[in-house]
């Protein structure tokens, strides 16, 4: 009887424990006037392969995209020079591996060839409940918070990671 009660409590705790996944937003202001500007050609020519790499990476869950598999069509600022990327990952390690240990890192290193400086922070990370996906409004609020107030459990970066709730 005691063992059954113990096992029941363990199973109940597992059911009550909320699972979390990592959301990220990355915002960039292009050097070009818009995504079709010739200065952006090389960057744009690699978007499909970089996005495919993300989608095939361990830990990848979801990314913001339209019906044509395009993320550059979203424009929450009503500014053609700004592009956003929002995605969801299983954990910090998965996103960090994709970002810095695959050919994606080449684009991080070459960022200044295509993009201007964007505020104090151009990306933000935060934890969301499993099976939930961030809206552009929510993601922008997280980034704005990080820019204005710095890292916290509400929004953080790779240098100051907050653990899952």
Annotated model-derived regions:
Residues 46-50, 84, 94, 107-110:
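Short, hydrophobic/aromatic alpha-helical segments in well-folded domains
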Residues 92-120:
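An amphipathic, aromatic/His-enriched active-site/gating alpha helix that lines ligand/cofactor pockets
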Residues 2-82, 121-165:
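Short S/T/G/P-rich N-terminal loop/turn motif that feeds into the first structured element of a domain
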């Amino acid at each position: 009887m005691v063992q059954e009660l113990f096992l029941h409590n363990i199973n109940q705790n597992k059911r009550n424990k909320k699972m979390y996944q990592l959301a990220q937003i990355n915002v960039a202001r292009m050097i070009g006037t818009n995504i079709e500007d010739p200065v952006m050609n090389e960057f744009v020519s690699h978007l499909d392969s970089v996005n495919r790499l993300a989608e095939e990476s361990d830990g990848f869950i979801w990314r913001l995209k339209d019906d044509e598999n395009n993320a550059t069509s979203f424009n929450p600022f009503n500014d053609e020079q700004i592009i956003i990327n929002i995605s969801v990952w299983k954990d910090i390690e998965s996103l960090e591996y994709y970002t810095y240990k695959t050919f994606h890192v080449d684009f991080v290193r070459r960022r200044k060839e295509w993009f201007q400086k964007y505020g104090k922070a151009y990306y933000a990370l935060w934890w969301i409940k499993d099976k939930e996906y961030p809206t552009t409004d929510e993601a922008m609020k997280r980034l704005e918070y990080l820019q204005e107030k710095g890292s916290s459990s509400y929004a953080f970066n790779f240098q100051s990671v907050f653990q899952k709730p």
